[in-house]
From Swiss-Prot:
GO terms for biological process: tRNA pseudouridine synthesis. Substrate binds at residue 111. Keywords: Isomerase, tRNA processing. It holds the Pfam family PseudoU_synth_1. Its EC number is 5.4.99.12. Belongs to the tRNA pseudouridine synthase TruA family. It comes from the Bacteria. InterPro entries: PsdUridine_synth_cat_dom_sf (IPR020103), PsdUridine_synth_TruA (IPR001406), PsdUridine_synth_TruA_a/b_dom (IPR020097), PsdUridine_synth_TruA_C (IPR020095), TruA/RsuA/RluB/E/F_N (IPR020094). The gene is truA. It catalyses: uridine(38/39/40) in tRNA = pseudouridine(38/39/40) in tRNA. Formation of pseudouridine at positions 38, 39 and 40 in the anticodon stem and loop of transfer RNAs. This is tRNA pseudouridine synthase A. The keyword tRNA processing applies.
Amino acid sequence: MMKIALTYSYNGSKFKGSQTQPDKNAVEDCLNFALNRVGIFKPVVSSSRTDKGVHAISQVSCVECGEFWNERFERLKNQINKHTKPYIYIKNIQKVSDEFHPRYDAVARSYRYIIYHDEQNVFLADYVHFYKTLNIQRLNIALKLFIGKHDFTPFYKVGSGEKSTVREIFYAKAYQIYKTKDAKFSAKFKTQKPTLTIINFKANGFLRAQVRLMVANALQACKSDENLYKFISNFKEQKPLTRMPSPPNGLYLKRVFY
């Protein structure tokens, strides 16, 4: 037997989260089914758990399989993808040590949150958070507060059984995308509103729903100077502006670092 790591993307709108479910409608369930079809019967172990509606650009899972597949990873990838398409796509397979654990060996994870400012579009509804307008300067001031090592008790879903609520955020910043080819000109002279706001986070780990709660609070904070000052004051006292997380459809697990 050997252990392999699968790197893959998935459309989270089609599943009830990533972790296996009793009704077999989770990402891991679909992946396990596909592996069973190619003769691999051990269940996968994943690096991160994502909620219903959350997507992944590069999730990592491990599974044990027979030595038959050693040096046949491209063939294995193609075989698995036949059974996971169109909502899960295996991008890479590699052999790892027997001691490797995709969750506990990860040193960092990054997430992306996409906010769409144009008119509502039913074809984008599963992939972005519709939000009419925001102040990018205030948003980045709010996001900067998250950087560093903090107790994120106010920013996670209670009852998820975490041993520690302390996490270290390495990066938290937003940028905007404009329709015009000359985005810098448009941003400088405010000739049009941005189409998208992209928020990127990187940390040594995240609590359940932490990213969505951080986004929700940052969006509340950027509504006005008063809200921003209140958020800054409340953050020191561990009092969030809201306990309602932002919608899951705009969130993407971007990368797991080892």
